[in-house]
Amino acid sequence: MLFQTLKSIGELYKEPMDMVQRRLDSLSKPLGSLGRLEDIIKKLAGITGEVFPCVDKKAVIIMCADNGVVEEGISSCPKDVTSKVTRNFLKGITAINAFAKHTGSDIVVVDIGVDDDMDCEGIVKRKVRKGTWNIAKGPAMTRKEAIEAIEVGISIVEELGRKGVNLLGTGEMGIGNTTTSSAVSTVLTDSKAENMVGRGAGLSDEALKRKISIVKKAIDLNRPDANDPIDVVSKVGGFDIAGLAGCFIGAAACRIPILIDGFISATAALAAVRMEPKVKNFIFPSHGSAEPGSKKVMEALGFEPILNLEMRVGEGTGAALAFHIFDCAVSVYRNMGTFEDACIEQYQPQV
């Protein structure tokens, strides 16, 4: 399934993008004055093939999984917070619930690897295993499990596409996943661990040093192949990262625009793009995470964040916030009058 899906990914549709540009230039405003909003509309048209794209049915996919590396003391939170917060998503009391409600978005909570029996009503049960192994002692998962987790993400997106979802956000929950994301991104960007590892949920200076040493140890021990993103994710990643990588791949194949959230989902996006570079055409950034590795990953992807609010909540909150920007971009493009409507002579570009 994975490799067939990768092969099916196409290019952006050029003709609708050209038609959108002509309409943008006809609107009663200085040429290009809507800035990046114009880029958003053109890319939406290129993805969907629609000259008047819609983003009225939104969803945030939250991949939830535990990470064995937590036993190394790299997190300020106990392991059981993963299952507790996952349940809280379904109770409607988390940050992403508040943001999603405000933007009229659904949230899709996926148990892809929580180390608990998640028999909650409303959860999508796609558990690969109850948590990964400790990357400081060996690989996080087998290659087969990594592919299985990626395919979970692909299938979730396909299901949402069949339901008419036309804008996706990505989120995650998993204690220890800033450590695994740091390890994966360190390898994929050929960086030093010191430049990629952050404080996560609020580590002390001493705990931060330990976290850096654990990331270095995991990479030295497992020797992931930077040219094989599946190998990297399987050796030093997590089920949430693999699942989110699958979401980006699935969105590209289904031609559904999809937003990165923060550091973890950006790392997953980078892994997906390394599997198939055309995946990038279907991805949008949302916000600049406060995690130090996030900037490096976004640079590797060639993206500039739309928002910079120094957030590091995760859960898909940055993506949900950026949904507002997409709503505004679509609204101004659809509803603004043309020069003809305004009885104003059209601007001509100055050469």
From Swiss-Prot:
Pathway: Nucleoside biosynthesis; alpha-ribazole biosynthesis; alpha-ribazole from 5,6-dimethylbenzimidazole: step 1/2. The keyword Transferase applies. The active site is at E315 (proton acceptor). Pfam families: DBI_PRT. It catalyses: 5,6-dimethylbenzimidazole + nicotinate beta-D-ribonucleotide = alpha-ribazole 5'-phosphate + nicotinate + H(+). Its EC number is 2.4.2.21. It comes from the Bacteria. Keywords: Cobalamin biosynthesis, Glycosyltransferase, Transferase. One of its GO terms (molecular function) is nicotinate-nucleotide-dimethylbenzimidazole phosphoribosyltransferase activity. One of its GO terms (biological process) is cobalamin biosynthetic process. Belongs to the CobT family. Catalyzes the synthesis of alpha-ribazole-5'-phosphate from nicotinate mononucleotide (NAMN) and 5,6-dimethylbenzimidazole (DMB). This is Nicotinate-nucleotide--dimethylbenzimidazole phosphoribosyltransferase. It comes from Acetivibrio thermocellus (strain ATCC 27405 / DSM 1237 / JCM 9322 / NBRC 103400 / NCIMB 10682 / NRRL B-4536 / VPI 7372). The gene is cobT.
